Amino acid sequence: MRKYFGTDGIRGRANGVITPELALKVGQAAGLLFQRGDHRHRVVIGKDTRLSGYMIETALVAGFTSVGMDVLLLGPMPTPAVAMLTRSMRADIGVMISASHNPYEDNGIKLFGPDGFKLSDEVEHEIERLLDADLQKRLSGSADLGRAKRIESVHARYIEFAKRTLPRSITLEGLRVVVDCANGAAYRVAPETLWELGAEVIAIGTEPDGFNINRDVGSTAPDALVRKVRELRADIGIALDGDADRVLVVDEKGQRVDGDQLMAVVARSWKEDQRLTQPGIVATIMSNLGLERYLGELGLGLVRTAVGDRYVLEYMREHGYNLGGEQSGHIIMSDYATTGDGLVAALQLLTVVQRQQRPVSEVCHCFDPLPQVLKNVRYRAGEPLRQDSVVTAIEGARQRLGNAGRLVIRPSGTEPVIRVMAEGDNRDLVVEVVDEVVEALRQAAA
């Protein structure tokens, strides 16, 4: 049982769970663990736009420098940019301070190895062991402390990286693009990248104030984007989340395009271009059965993993896949990046749109998703899923669905929430079984 790390780093209420003391210890523990060889060790630190980012950044700097590591500060940058710059700047470790799509009150710490990949469970376990240890005797002497330096021009480096994922022959000229940056980490780089590629860009969610990240904007709140796309008759809307590792697209009609549909478009395009390294893609248990059926028609398979982009990526790396992701919009293209990258995923879709010279609605309507219902049940303590009444409700729901659908029950890895998802050909039945399980969970959690 892990004490600090969830499925996406350490996350919780800022100054409640994520305290300066914890951040200091994380810097010391990770700094000690990743000091290998005799060279001068360095860590790259980026963050999103939450007010608490200043506090956590400062504490991390103290932790890393106290064990002799030099710190390179990037300021507000997308998570995939931090991963990329960790590799590019030959750092021993990378850190992203973010709670992704969560509200500003939360924050988190994500760690990357020198290769830009998220840490394995084993490495995180070793860091947890050090977090609970007395490290005082392992701190550096006065002459061996690290230094901190703020790095300039990092935005331009990431913009150039993102642009290079498009073929040289492709421009975005003639496209009117609305991009919603969630008042988060991509508020500068996303609009600039799209503009440099030739698009007419209308940007929203680009005025962070420390409190408004993800508030009524971004990939988890796309209504503002939908309205703006319709109002301006834009060709496409692109919504990123707070740290820009996930994306949701809106077509010219204001219809939402989720991660499943994005993966379908890219999988078809890459199959035609013979770019897929395996005859299929990797997704999670939450991806729609319609995606699986569509890929089957193309002669491609769908491998499902546990929920979490880290598990998708682990399977991709172990089995040689170069395309995978989540319905929520984490799209991983290992030809380009070591983590989900919302901007790069959107650019790959725009590549297909420009090549085919068709509206986004036509390009993205690959399959009809099966009716799918997802509800969240919040609980305070205990294990509601172990209650007899809940077990009985789940068994009954699965029997009612039979072979005509799927039921997925899973606890969130980042918050005290249980997610209940069902899908099938009969929407009324799907709604009924989800409501039955949700009611049982609510009673058990009361």
Swiss-Prot record:
Its EC number is 5.4.2.10. Activated by phosphorylation. Keywords: Isomerase, Magnesium, Metal-binding, Phosphoprotein. Binds 1 Mg(2+) ion per subunit. Its cofactor is Mg(2+). The active site is at residue 100. This is Phosphoglucosamine mutase. The gene is glmM.
